Regions:
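Phosphate/nucleotide-binding beta-alpha loop and adjacent structural elements of enzyme active sites
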Residues: 1-179
Length: 179
């Protein structure tokens, strides 16, 4: 996972929400070695891989929780082909198999750690929870320098663009998917 590197930018705090196996966290750790990186991943198997893949990086803080708009436990349906497509929305996966996971209000988490005014990069890839997560931090968006967000669906795109355009210049990069 490669994201554009911002020139003359030395982030101190990065949030990787939906860290999956840790590829993006490692990308950030390599390119921004002075940054603290909080990596959120709620499912057991993905979290084990996240731990294993990132064990050599001292600046990655792994959190076995998912971000959401409230604190709750929820079913995450486990895609049988790709753990990166696990979702709380059953119809987004190809499986009835699920895992009960802990979800936390991201805004409250950031406030409790006194991090709301210090976020340099926020990356979100959460298979359908993007709007819920943005709503939990909406009042803090203006304090985030760079946001990388993967969203799914035209309806989500419109809502996300509306939320983000109030505080950020939005640049879209269209993904091409192929089976």
């Amino acid at each position: 996972y490669a994201y554009p590197i911002v020139e003359n930018f030395n982030p101190k705090l990065i949030l990787d929400v939906g860290a999956n196996l840790g590829a993006t966290s490692m990308f950030f750790a390599i390119n921004y070695p002075k940054a603290r990186i909080f990596s959120f991943e709620p499912t057991q198997m993905n979290f084990r891989w996240l731990q294993k893949n990132t064990e050599g990086f001292k600046n990655i803080i792994r959190i076995k929780k998912g971000a959401y708009f409230k604190d709750t436990n929820a079913k995450i349906f486990l895609d049988s082909e790709n753990g990166g497509r696990n979702s709380i929305y059953k119809d987004w996966t190809n499986s009835d198999k699920y895992e009960l996971v802990e979800l936390i209000n991201l805004g409250k988490f950031l406030e409790s750690k006194n991090l709301v005014k210090k976020i340099d990069i926020l990356k979100i890839d959460t298979e359908g929870c993007e709007i819920d997560i943005l709503s939990s931090i909406e009042q803090h968006l203006k304090n985030i320098q760079v946001i990388y967000l993967e969203y799914h669906g035209k309806n989500n795109e419109e809502v996300i663009m509306e939320i983000l355009s109030e505080s950020h210049v939005v640049k879209q990069k269209k993904a091409v998917a192929q089976k």
